[in-house]
Amino acid sequence: MGPTSGSQLLVLLLLLASSLLALGSPMYSIITPNVLRLESEETFILEAHDAQGDVPVTVTVQDFLKKQVLTSEKTVLTGATGHLNRVFIKIPASKEFNADKGHKYVTVVANFGATVVEKAVLVSFQSGYLFIQTDKTIYTPGSTVFYRIFTVDNNLLPVGKTVVIVIETPDGVPIKRDILSSHNQYGILPLSWNIPELVNMGQWKIRAFYEHAPKQTFSAEFEVKEYVLPSFEVLVEPTEKFYYIHGPKGLEVSITARFLYGKNVDGTAFVIFGVQDEDKKISLALSLTRVLIEDGSGEAVLSRKVLMDGVRPSSPEALVGKSLYVSVTVILHSGSDMVEAERSGIPIVTSPYQIHFTKTPKFFKPAMPFDLMVFVTNPDGSPARRVPVVTQGSDAQALTQDDGVAKLSVNTPNNRQPLTITVSTKKEGIPDARQATRTMQAQPYSTMHNSNNYLHLSVSRVELKPGDNLNVNFHLRTDAGQEAKIRYYTYLVMNKGKLLKAGRQVREPGQDLVVLSLPITPEFIPSFRLVAYYTLIGANGQREVVADSVWVDVKDSCVGTLVVKGDPRDNRQPAPGHQTTLRIEGNQGARVGLVAVDKGVFVLNKKNKLTQSKIWDVVEKADIGCTPGSGKNYAGVFMDAGLTFKTNQGLQTDQREDPECAKPAARRRRSVQLMERRMDKAGQYTDKGLRKCCEDGMRDIPMPYSCQRRARLITQGESCLKAFMDCCNYITKLREQHRRDHVLGLARSDVDEDIIPEEDIISRSHFPESWLWTIEELKEPEKNGISTKVMNIFLKDSITTWEILAVSLSDKKGICVADPYEITVMQDFFIDLRLPYSVVRNEQVEIRAVLFNYREQEKLKVRVELLHNPAFCSMATAKKRYYQTIEIPPKSSVAVPYVIVPLKIGLQEVEVKAAVFNHFISDGVKKILKVVPEGMRVNKTVAVRTLDPEHLNQGGVQREDVNAADLSDQVPDTDSETRILLQGTPVAQMAEDAVDGERLKHLIVTPSGCGEQNMIGMTPTVIAVHYLDQTEQWEKFGLEKRQEALELIKKGYTQQLAFKQPISAYAAFNNRPPSTWLTAMWSRSFSLAANLIAIDSQVLCGAVKWLILEKQKPDGVFQEDGPVIHQEMIGGFRNTKEADVSLTAFVLIALQEARDICEGQVNSLPGSINKAGEYLEASYLNLQRPYTVAIAGYALALMNKLEEPYLTKFLNTAKDRNRWEEPGQQLYNVEATSYALLALLLLKDFDSVPPVVRWLNDERYYGGGYGSTQATFMVFQALAQYRADVPDHKDLNMDVSLHLPSRSSPTVFRLLWESGSLLRSEETKQNEGFSLTAKGKGQGTLSVVTVYHAKVKGKTTCKKFDLRVTIKPAPETAKKPQDAKSSMILDICTRYLGDVDATMSILDISMMTGFIPDTNDLELLSSGVDRYISKYEMDKAFSNKNTLIIYLEKISHSEEDCLSFKVHQFFNVGLIQPGSVKVYSYYNLEESCTRFYHPEKDDGMLSKLCHNEMCRCAEENCFMHQSQDQVSLNERLDKACEPGVDYVYKTKLTTIELSDDFDEYIMTIEQVIKSGSDEVQAGQERRFISHVKCRNALKLQKGKQYLMWGLSSDLWGEKPNTSYIIGKDTWVEHWPEAEERQDQKNQKQCEDLGAFTETMVVFGCPN
């Protein structure tokens, strides 16, 4: 063997040794969740594979830039634990994690002895959850919202933290903001909010978030609406959840109607079916049926024929993909209540099932079983139970379980091609063509180094619950001869984003299948992921990791226990006001939040209830695992399960970049509902567009327009016009042949009106919609793990079903929502008093009391009474009680109507009592009726002012004076409310976009060459790292690239030291003279790099000392004796002009930047800086070059010396205020402007900064290239400083004081940026002027709105519009809602009086009281090719009457345009106030016309309801006209001197002003007989006001004289504009004049009036 052979042997031996070493080298790994949550305890798993002996491990978590250690833990990996251990880490929330700036990372460093494993991990601010429970789901204006906020951590255990709570309007405007702590609150914050009376209707929101995590918000919604609780509920259920288009049967629906107290309803249901296509509803007119509801149930059927006849084209294929809906309105036989219900989204399908692969992994292992989790749903998305499913080409078959999921195992081929799998249902009775089928494609798992090493996990498909054991099968497949190396599997359990468990499953030699028995504990709810892996040295000698994962569902339930129930021994029927028992069973120490809610609340709004499933939904959404299991390779398995994995041998997962999983594309769901039936005529048009034109021509419209007139509106072309005319003429002839009447009526039996005296009965009067809002603690020791609390509660007065809702929070078991417990409260005889939400003062209204008799056999004879209340006119008066006697058959009810006229504004009591003859049975009900003022509620904007005290006013204090509102048209005897609204205007400081970090990759290079070349290479790397650090863009650039860049900087630093001369200065080569500029540049670069790598301060400060001692002249100037060879690296300094100033400024900047490091080591540093600064000051004003002005300006700014006059010079040198420019020198200009930007940032001149940054960005200069060293360094230093310094918003800190004359002290508000958009309000009932002062920084808005009721005037002027409005009864054949009392047709005709048509015009229509428009008519007018209106809107937000807005494309100037639609009356009101119609042009609001409308009165309508005393009572608020026959002198004196009489006048009526609501009488005071509160003098005028309904009773005549007196409570308004109300206590008596005294019957009265006057004036009233 020659020498060569010997050397070959040596090489072989070395290779063998190295491979043996590789086999034995341990693999250290760290596994963490790939999203770490701040302030939460996280588990990190540490492993050493193939290690010998104990391995000490230190785990440190640092901020991403590794400037700060956040937390650290130590442990030891021992052989006893298989070198597997865990540490618990809690990362504190600190200001470094500013949530506003993109994603945040931490660096996790694990030191396994001397081996370091390091990984950047994403951080999340979610440190827990907030769950919000409201006491109800719907509220009325003026009521109180009670709500609780449960503060829990990520394990759902109570936590004490600071919470921010915001209440938002439906428009998203925050109006209330509280910051509260849940410390010492046991995790429950009980709160309330009073809803104002004046409030926007709609969906309000309570938003809450932890103070340290403002982006992680949680919310609950509640509805604000004017409503009255219904007395029963209606449920509509189809027999099947889908409609099978090829089935012979129709769609059957069952209707269930039950009173809230559990008894069945008898009534009538009106049912209509329809088809919904996207957002278009097609009602099937022929499907409208009337269904009798007997004993609570009824049925309706949509036949296949009606469905197919009602749509065009009439083919099954055209309907597939659409859905059916059914709308049901149930009316009680008594007519006292009606409830609507709708069931929509019933899909029309060819197959009754749908197959989904959402729970199936997307990757398979070749030649190993693939577990398909097939999710089968009904077409409505609900799970399809017990449906057989099969895979094509395989014998695999399974049955879906209750959750709709079936597990199918498929054997896969031994190749790495994508696997296509088709799954079908196999339900008996359905043809193969109609079975559901779905295909998916699975991708092969990619092994490392193309090996055949695989792991497959499989679990059985059972519904798991705590206490069960899950068998997990580990299936192994390896390359030949490799399986012996696998001695164990490491497995991990992920739940709720946390590593819950880690362990080892041992594998014995020869075992292909290993089974792990995993106990399921409550912590595993609601689901978990099991991840397992093994590692080995593969056949190629390379380390390999093989992994798999599986997602496992666990039955959703509480971790703990909470049950609410009654006393099992108490079998009595709960009755109103009686005591009952509640038993609460739960975990000891838990606190239970209770509430009892009337079930009627959930009939109106069942959304937004807090349930346990909603809690788990929120938790599941926060899961950081993203797939149903497996992954594309080992790293994908970890990544998709929510884990990060890193080893010392380069094996690792990819970087996670978003805390949330990528959302799959949202699947559009088809909605469901109504439209008109197509007739055969339309079927003649096969073109879809022409068919639409034909159908619109056949629509019935309310206006009497001819086909020709209608066709003028068509813009779709000639063919559409012809189709429209053809079908319009066709249907017109058809209608003439077929005229049909269709009248639906409801009969009502007469009632007996005998009057019988009545004993007192205690009325039920407390009807809360929710109560029992308490928190109870379970203190009793546990028995069988349960603590019980027994509560005795008194039920409220409602006859209903109460739902008792309970939510508990326990230190050990977390949050739990109990199933609702129902308490049905009733008695077998009772009154249900049905009241509207509100009525208008002085308007007659009908209310109904329904009496129920639930006795099985007995007919009851009942005396029922409406009690007198002076706040109402009714048949019951102060003198006579109003009884009726009625008979109620067993198990039925009788409605008793009452007509009342409310006289007083506010909340008034209505009380009805009933007693049964010959029985000790009675009931009484006292309810509150809201009475609102007449007239129209007006929101008058009094003032809108901008608050900007810093800029709008001298001295920084802004004063605003606001006058009182002009309320001259206010309805008498009503209040006004002024709302003063303040809102900050948060102005964002729009930061310019950062330069994209990805564009900087060319700057990070390996430095090399001489001392100058090394600096040219290294400087861009230093500045690029600095810039990426400051702008937090490493995520884009590549997190792992930062460490590589730092290594290059270290290399450059080491290399540069080779060029350090003994005197500590630097040159290109050691034999060259040292360079002042190069040494200063070295100092600048490594002062910056000192934050990145370890720099020897002595080396750095040695260079600083050399510059000062060797290169600074006595006058402060620095000199250059060794110019650099590479002149291109020195930037703008290369221009020799003003070189001394440029170099001195450059070195001065270097000294300032090194000052923090070197001030302690170089004593002469401050003096040197000052000398250089003085030189720059002396030279500055004479500088010519913009470059020198900029660099010297920055040097002076560093010394706080860039002040006047230098500042003006500095700013004026800028061209266009955005750049310091020399012609044709782009690099110099970028460098100079960067220096200037740094100076502006030091000056905090943030108004001048944006245009400069914009210019630098617009230059698109990304550094690099010949001669770019200085420009690159400076632009990125300046832009990095800009990102660090510029505030993200302009300051807002303003104090606002309101000075209201009626208040003794000012009201003070503080507007701050944090809560700037919060709308603050102050309300006052006084209509008064006030002043406001504002001081501080920022902007805000003051808005002052006065809300009051304005009188409606009948006369209006018209400008440029002619308008006619009429109203007439609708014909008997007209279709109207079943609960409408009457229907009328409103005709509106208008013409524009200009030369051309008025475009974009608006009709603003206020409805008459009790009337609402027919929306079907409005839909008709707004749809179709012949559209008469563009759109319409209903507005009820601030009104007790409906307002309808109609938008018109144009109003003709040559002919009248008319609209007609029905309006329906839903309550019988007596005095119907007029409605109004206003037309105006959108483009010129001054061009408008208003007209009023009112049905013709038949004797004023009030007389129709006069019976016995009713008329007098209906006019009880009018005075009783005095005649001389009735009253003696003494009676006059007695009446005039009664307590409360304020004034006695002789008056003369001079003027009468009549309006639709009130009459005003202007009286001249002829004589003050008795003076009162108003200091009026004879001869002065005063205004007397009376309601219009008293006009006929008063019969006052102009020019006549009257004796008048009244109460002080009837005086209204402020002096000197006092008005007098003529009310029921006002005395008005005609005073005959001289010529009238000739009549003998007037003489006695005149004598008495003279004597009365003399007595009152001389003697006055007796005390």
Curated annotation (Swiss-Prot):
Taxonomy, superkingdom: Eukaryota
GO biological process terms held by the UniProt record: amyloid-beta clearance; B cell activation; chemotaxis; complement activation; complement activation, alternative pathway; complement activation, classical pathway; complement receptor mediated signaling pathway; complement-dependent cytotoxicity
Keywords annotated in UniProt: Chemotaxis, Cleavage on pair of basic residues, Complement alternate pathway, Complement pathway, Disulfide bond, Fatty acid metabolism, Glycoprotein, Immunity, Inflammatory response, Innate immunity, Lipid metabolism, Phosphoprotein, Secreted, Signal, Thioester bond
Region described as Interaction with CFP/properdin: 1634-1659
One of the record's GO molecular function terms: receptor ligand activity
Subcellular location: Secreted
Matches recorded under InterPro entries: A-macroglobulin_rcpt-bd, A-macroglobulin_rcpt-bd_sf, A2M/Complement_sys, A2M_N_BRD, Alpha-macroglob_thiol-ester_cl, Alpha-macroglobulin_TED, Anaphylatoxin/fibulin, Anaphylatoxin_comp_syst
Activity regulation remarks: Complement activation is inhibited by VSIG4.
Record-annotated NTR domain positions: 1518-1661
GO cellular component: cell surface; extracellular region; extracellular space; protein-containing complex
The keyword Ribosomal protein is assigned to this record: no
Pfam families, sorted: A2M, A2M_BRD, A2M_recep, ANATO, C3_CUB1, C3_CUB2, MG1, MG2
Location of cross-link Isoglutamyl cysteine thioester (Cys-Gln): C1010-Q1013
Main location class: secreted
Disulfide topology: C558-C816, C626-C661, C693-C720, C694-C727, C707-C728, C873-C1513, C1101-C1158, C1358-C1489, C1389-C1458, C1506-C1511, C1518-C1590, C1537-C1661
Post-translational modification: C3 precursor is first processed by the removal of 4 Arg residues, forming two chains, beta and alpha, linked by a disulfide bond. During activation of the complement systems, the alpha chain is cleaved into C3a and C3b by the C3 convertase: C3b stays linked to the beta chain, while C3a is released in the plasma. The alpha chain is cleaved by the serine protease complement C2b component of the C3 convertase to generate C3a and C3b following activation by the classical, lectin and GZMK complement systems. Phosphorylated by FAM20C in the extracellular medium.
Residue(s) at site: Coordinates Mg(2+) for interaction with Complement factor B Bb fragment (CFB): N1663
Name of this protein: Complement C3
Gene name for this UniProt entry: C3
